[in-house]
């Protein structure tokens, strides 16, 4: 007889967290957010279920990258038509649509299946300090994605 407890979707309490991305490192922030979305920070984590929490990221326009990535990192998209490839640097995309940078980084760290698409809908990213989710009473989560030697 097994004593393994499998959580059901009724017994899950999904919290809302708000994270300030000001001066946070992009990849390290995305990694932590992906863990929270999947529910890996909970003892009830189950790989095939959505046991994660909702995450609101504010100040997405102030996220940081190290080195020369701001000018060298490229974001590609394609319209699907011949010659429809568009390439943008991190710097230009941050000026135009800053929330897309964090969304692409987090989406790349989620599973590439139906569960990953469902988890991605629980991520809300906003370029400024305001968000429309006050009714959910999100609790502030402080992440330190800046290594000690890198100020």
Curated annotation (Swiss-Prot):
Region of interest (Disordered), residue spans: 126-151
SUPFAM superfamilies membership: Ribosomal protein L13
Keyword Ribonucleoprotein (UniProt): yes
Top-rank taxon: Bacteria
PROSITE patterns: RIBOSOMAL_L13 (PS00783)
One Gene Ontology cellular component annotation held by this UniProt entry: cytosolic large ribosomal subunit
Protein purpose: This protein is one of the early assembly proteins of the 50S ribosomal subunit, although it is not seen to bind rRNA by itself. It is important during the early stages of 50S assembly.
Listed PANTHER family: LARGE RIBOSOMAL SUBUNIT PROTEIN UL13M, RIBOSOMAL PROTEIN L13
Name used for this protein in its record: Large ribosomal subunit protein uL13
Species, as recorded: Crocosphaera subtropica (strain ATCC 51142 / BH68) (Cyanothece sp. (strain ATCC 51142))
Lineage: Bacteria, Bacillati, Cyanobacteriota, Cyanophyceae, Oscillatoriophycideae
